[in-house]
From Swiss-Prot:
GO terms for cellular component: plasma membrane. It is a multi-pass membrane protein. GO terms for molecular function: xenobiotic transmembrane transporter activity. It is found in: Cell inner membrane. The chain crosses the membrane at residues 16-36, 333-353, 360-380, 387-407, 431-451, 459-479, 528-548, 853-873, 875-895, 897-917, 953-973, 984-1004. It comes from the Bacteria. Belongs to the resistance-nodulation-cell division (RND) (TC 2.A.6) family. MdtC subfamily. Part of a tripartite efflux system composed of MdtA, MdtB and MdtC. MdtC forms a heteromultimer with MdtB. NCBIfam families: PRK10614.1, RND_permease_2. This is Multidrug resistance protein MdtC. Keywords: Cell inner membrane, Cell membrane, Membrane, Transmembrane, Transmembrane helix, Transport. Its main location: membrane.
């Protein structure tokens, strides 16, 4: 063909074109960002609203529900959940993949504005939103500690200055400040003193509010000068509030200090953070959905010197945990695997061809194909991540195949005595169509993946496109650079004097002769081979159905998250003690590097810990082994449970949970949900396939239910509004005024002095001043009794919801756990009013299960169509595809042998095998058809000769692909758990297919030929009659 000759006869142009591809790839490599995995995060927006002192049920009905109704009208929302706790509501909105996060944010703001008129008037601020997923693991955690500054002052610096600067960094989605609260002036009232003076709590509130005002006063001017008016209307510190007059009693002033303790304190006293055994304020940084982890972390670290400058020297700002080191280490491991794979496949070529000059050709072609791929990756907006680098590692065995097929055929002609230039022209013409068929049919495997939407399509896109581009570049290089180098580098009659070369050559010749004898026997017993092939198909189906399955392999990222759940009626002080105890035990583990944690806020029975493990090279055990060890140590800790999870790079959904997987219960009947949730949770706990079973239903908190006697209230001259104001003033940490300062605003918080609220008898000291100015004790018009109350109320899609979370015990797959859950739900007879479904990662797994088989069938169909077009035949593609069952059996048996569940990574391996193993059949069928057409050979002689002639390149390409996957199988460093399933699948499939297809393909070829001839004969006979 003139196309091939053009490059062979113009070596300078071909060389420069190759250099251009390589240089473009090098430039692309330097510009590519780095990430752990392809960008598959769902767009998530978190809406927050607060109403201090409001119960969870009040927050759910008056705040969450109006917002949810308005937000639920936004297009592209795939999931909306909310959690309402004491004084706080948080709504998590997960959008479809194709929804632009900025456009979604504008719609969210519009929906908040539309719902504003339906929200309570007492809210201190409008609802706000953040473009971040609170369930995502932080990319960095900073701590502030000091021996000089109080936690409140540290929190002030963190929230006022540091969080503001960090939030401005590109890629930062949310900065959560925890461990304390903003400074505030706290007014702790003495109810007995108030009663003695005849002063109501609400009168104190109004006095303080009126005394602290920031209003414009205007200006005074005459004809020549203008004076701005300024008054001392604002109060800043506790000492300025103490002398305020709240009442006159018989002409004597009753000052605030007479009836209350006023001090500079914090806005919420129920917050605590710890780091290294000391009180600390934490800055928990999360990225936006579309941000790159490494780039964002690098930008944050670049800002650290400036951050240190804006805080006092006595404050110690440290990076306690950083997600990037393990990501970088994992990518270094993949890069090493890639280099090893390149070296191994070149070694295969050298062993078979026994020529340094011949080996030099693929030694150039392979790196050029791989390096050139980086340019396309940059243009496509991809990153250097575990999947894209794995694609290049596997591609090493593919791209060398094209070079091997061309090189081996040209070398065969040279060894037969032909001159290199003539051999190059003839050899590339003979196998040009073969190489094209091999490459295009391999790329066809990925077409269904590229058309698949959702998580799987996004997850596979980079891998598929990267591998396809590498194959296309390899195809171009193999028919241009490879024959040109053969024409000028190969020498006719190459010496064979070295004993090692003679030994390798004799060994290959002996193996080929043995194959010829065994093939003769097989062709004489074709029926048995066909039965074996059918048995292989049946075994493949059975193995695929029965093998344990999971979503993605469990990663060891060197990070653990710990959720502490205590009794729902526990006090904040007791919960803080639990946090300290757990952190001390976890921090003492030899494989733990650092632990930070905090508790408090609106859910005082919960604590959160972030645990960083030592680098994998410095610790004895994996993350799961560390979790198992800590779980055993903490099993007998009284009063609280610690749930530990290994942080994963991919987390589906926006739910914050105490375990890795979730099962969601929904109902429009809250009573039915609260009845059935404990039964379902107990049944799940008894399942051996589940571990760490827990629920987010918090309905066992203690409350004191007050019942108003409305008739008595009317007679006494008071109303419900005044009574509720009394309770809020006394026990709600009510924010009654705002202190304005240049950098921030702080609150004045009023409540009854905690010394008088140690037990429920404090209610007996509460009173309301009626319309006649008389103090009316609360007990005169209200009765109270203890009851259970929810600490939080959860919604999903406007329905009441409860989420049961669970982990997997060692040796149990997600498919086994899912089947156990479905059996249990059926056995329990749960009513239709309570709906159960998997959520988060478990839901994504269920969806992937339904699509995996269709993806494989679609890939096979795509390959068949491409081969049918190339061969202009309905029959020959079936011969080529008959190689697939043996590869499937080998892959699934290898996974079972290594005790590895079938995951999305293994699915990639299966799809790759569909493209790989058919190469052997293509080389056989091409040469057999050529021999039939031009050599006038019978079908049996043609396929027999094709098998022998192509035995060496088949063996070379198979071993090259096998050695390309071998580094992934043997890897043991960071990220090995992601790479091993791919390597195991490909290696197992290649070994089994190599053993079987050398015999099954010629048998199927002859069977198909008989069918084709029989049909042709029948057609001729029908025409004649």
């Amino acid at each position: 063909m003139k196309f091939f000759a053009l490059f062979i006869h113009r070596p300078v142009a071909t060389t420069l074109l190759t250099l251009a591809i390589a240089l473009a790839g090098i430039l692309g490599f330097r510009l590519l960002p780095v990430a752990p995995l392809p960008q598959v995060d769902f767009p998530v927006i978190m809406v927050s609203a607060s109403l201090p002192g409001a119960s969870p049920e009040t927050m759910a009905s008056s705040v969450a529900t109006p917002l949810e109704r308005s937000l639920g009208r936004i297009a592209g929302v795939s999931e909306m959940t909310s959690t309402s706790s004491l004084g706080s509501t948080r709504i998590i909105m997960v959008f479809d993949f194709d929804r632009d996060i900025n456009g979604a944010a504008r719609d969210v703001q519009a929906a908040i504005n539309a719902a504003q008129s339906l929200l309570p008037t007492g809210m201190p601020s409008r609802p706000t939103y953040r473009k971040a997923n609170p369930s995502d693991a932080p990319i960095m955690i900073m701590t502030l500690t000091s021996d000089l500054y109080s936690p409140a002052q540290l929190y002030d610096y963190a929230s006022t200055q540091l969080a503001q600067k960090l939030s401005q960094i590109n890629g930062v989605g949310d900065v959560t400040v925890g461990g304390s609260s903003l400074p505030a002036v706290r007014v702790a009232l003495n109810p007995q003193a108030l009663f003695n003076q005849g002063v109501s709590l609400d009168a104190v509130r109004q006095t303080i509010s009126n005394a602290n005002q920031r209003r414009p006063q205007g200006a005074v001017e005459d004809g020549q000068q203008r004076w701005q008016l300024r008054t001392n209307d604002a109060l800043q510190t506790a000492s300025e509030y103490q002398p305020l007059v709240v009442h006159y009693n018989n002409g004597a002033a009753v000052r605030l200090s007479d009836v209350a303790t006023v001090q500079d304190s914090v806005q919420d006293v129920r917050n605590a953070g710890m780091s290294r055994g000391k009180p600390a304020v934490l800055l928990v940084i999360r990225k936006t959905a579309d941000a790159n982890v490494i780039e964002t972390v690098d930008r944050i670290r670049a800002e650290l010197p400036e951050l240190h400058e804006i805080i006092p020297a006595a404050i110690n700002l440290e990076v306690a945990q950083d997600r990037s080191p393990t990501i970088r280490a994992s990518l270094e491991e993949v890069e090493q695997s890639l280099m090893i794979a390149v070296a191994l496949v070149i070694l295969v070529v050298f062993v078979f061809l026994r020529s340094g000059r011949a080996t030099l050709i693929p030694a150039v072609a392979v790196p050029v194909s791989l390096i050139g791929t980086f340019a396309a990756m940059y243009l496509c907006g991809f990153s250097l991540n575990n999947l894209s680098l794995m694609a290049l590692t596997i591609a090493t065995g593919f791209v060398v195949d094209d070079a091997i097929v061309v090189l081996e055929n040209i070398a065969r002609h040279v060894e037969a005595g032909m001159k290199p230039m003539a051999a190059a022209l003839k050899g590339v013409r003979e196998v040009g169509f073969t190489v094209l068929s091999m490459s295009l049919s391999l790329i066809a495997v990925f077409l269904p993946l590229l058309m698949t939407g959702g998580l799987i399509g996004r997850f596979f896109a980079e891998f598929s496109i990267t591998l396809s581009v590498a194959i296309l570049i390899s195809l171009f290089v193999s028919v241009t650079l490879t024959p040109m180098m053969c024409a000028y580098l190969l020498k006719p009659h190459a010496p064979r004097s070295q004993p090692q070369r003679r030994g390798v050559g004799r060994l290959l010749l002996a193996v080929q002769r043995g194959y010829a004898r065994s093939l003769t026997v097989v062709l004489n017993h074709a029926r048995w081979v066909l039965l074996l092939l059918l048995g292989t198909v049946a075994l493949t189906v059975w193995l695929f159905i029965s093998i344990p399955k999971t979503f993605l392999p469990e990663q060891d990222t060197g990070r653990l998250s710990g959720f502490i759940s205590a009794d729902q009626s526990i006090s904040f002080q007791a919960m803080r003690g639990k946090l300290e105890d757990f952190m001390k035990i976890v921090g003492a583990d030899p494989d733990v590097s650092s632990v930070v944690g905090f508790t408090g806020g609106m859910r005082t029975n919960m604590g959160l810990m972030f645990i960083s493990l030592k680098p994998l090279s410095e610790r004895k055990d994996t993350a799961q082994a560390v979790i198992a060890r800590l779980r055993a140590k903490l099993a007998n800790e009284p009063g609280a449970n610690l749930y530990l999870n290994a942080v994963q790079d991919i987390r589906v959904g926006g739910r914050e949970a105490n375990a890795s997987y979730q099962y969601s219960l929904l109902s429009d009947d809250l009573a039915a949900l609260r009845t059935w949730e404990p039964k379902i949770r107990q049944a799940f706990t008894a399942l051996p396939e589940l571990a760490d079973v827990n629920s987010d239903q918090q309905d066992k908190g203690s409350e004191m239910a007050l019942t108003y006697d409305r008739a008595s209230m009317a007679r006494l001259g008071i109303n419900v509004s005044e009574a509720n104001a009394l309770l809020n003033d006394a026990f709600g940490q009510r924010q009654i005024s705002t202190i304005y300062q240049p950098l921030n605003q702080y609150k004045v918080v009023m409540e009854v002095d905690p010394r008088y609220t140690q037990d429920i008898s404090a209610l007996n000291q509460m009173f309301v001043i009626n319309s006649e100015g008389k103090p009316i004790p609360l007990a005169w018009f209200a009765k109270w009794q203890p009851a259970n109350a929810p600490l939080s109320v959860n919604h999903e899609g406007l329905s009441a919801a409860s989420t049961i979370s669970f982990n997997l015990p060692e040796g149990v797959s997600l498919s086994q756990a899912s089947e156990a859950i479905e059996r249990t739900m059926t056995a329990l007879g749960v009513p239709s009013s309570v709906r159960g479904s998997f959520a988060g990662t478990a839901q994504a797994f269920q969806q992937s299960q339904s699509s995996q088989l269709w993806l494989m069938l679609a890939a096979i169909a795509a390959v068949y169509i491409v081969l049918g077009i190339l061969y202009e035949s309905y029959v020959h593609p079936l011969t080529i595809l008959s190689t697939l069952p043996s590869a499937g059996v080998g892959a699934l048996l290898a996974l079972a042998l290594f005790d590895t569940p079938f995951s999305l990574i293994a699915l990639i391996g299966i799809l790759l095998l569909i493209g790989i193993v058919k190469k052997n059949a293509i080389m056989m069928v091409d040469f057999a058809l050529e021999a039939e057409r031009n050599g006038n050979l019978s079908p049996r002689d043609a396929i027999f000769q094709a098998c022998l002639l192509r035995f060496r390149p088949i063996l070379m390409t198979t071993l090259a692909a096998l050695f390309g996957a071998l580094p992934l199988v043997l890897t043991s460093g960071d990220g090995a758990e992601l790479r091993q399933p791919l390597g195991i699948t490909i290696a197992g499939g290649l070994i089994m297919s190599q053993l079987l297809t050398l015999y099954t393909t010629p048998v199927v070829y002859l069977m198909m030929d008989k069918l084709r001839r029989k049909k042709r004969t029948q057609t001729i006979n029908a025409t004649q009659h």
